[in-house]
Regions:
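Mid-chain, well-packed structural core segment of small domains
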Residues: 58-93
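Short beta->alpha junction loops
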Residues: 35-45
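Short beta->alpha linker loops
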Residues: 42-43, 65, 115
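Short, hinge-like loop/turn segments at secondary-structure boundaries
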Residues: 54-55, 78-79, 101-106
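Short, glycine-/small-residue-rich phosphate/pyrophosphate-handling segment
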Residues: 37-38, 85, 94-133
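N-terminal nucleotide-binding beta1-loop-alpha1 segment
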Residues: 1-5
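Glycine- and acidic-residue-enriched helix-capping/strand-helix junction motifs
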Residues: 6-23
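Short acidic active-site motifs
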Residues: 46-50
């Protein structure tokens, strides 16, 4: 599940987020045979609805800027039984001070950030190796 502005990957600030769009990233990888469903929304409530209605074995969540501001998304992650790994493309600890704290991190089972789109690969590897998804 990708949050706000991640629909602009490949176009938005490529020095921070890279020059590859998410659809291109998905098409270029087979993800070790793991079945993936992809969802992106710029709307907080839609992200919450997707978290609450998911029947997935695991969720990779990049809430974008909502990671730093949305108590509602944080509470949704805490409320569901599906394990969630929080990812960020950029190294949020090395960016502006307001990006240093994630409200989601304390309720996710883990956090991966700063490795570009490889952050998603690392989250998938974690779930495959630890949850046998």
């Amino acid at each position: 599940i990708n949050g706000p502005n991640l629909n602009l990957l490949g176009k938005r600030n490529p020095t921070v987020y890279g020059d590859v769009g998410f659809d291109e990233y998905l098409a270029a990888n087979n993800f070790a045979g793991v079945e993936l469903d992809y969802y992106q929304s710029n709307v907080e409530g839609e992200i919450i609805n997707m978290l609450q209605s998911s029947d997935a074995d695991a969720i990779i969540l990049n809430a974008g800027g909502y990671a730093h501001t949305s108590v509602a998304i944080r509470d949704a992650v805490e409320a569901i039984s599906v394990p969630v790994v929080e990812v960020h493309i950029s190294n949020i600890a090395a960016r502006e001070a307001f990006r240093h704290e994630s409200l989601i991190s304390p309720v996710a089972i883990g956090c991966i950030f700063g490795f570009g789109l490889k952050s998603y690969d690392l989250a998938i590897d974690y779930f495959v190796n630890h949850f046998k998804v």
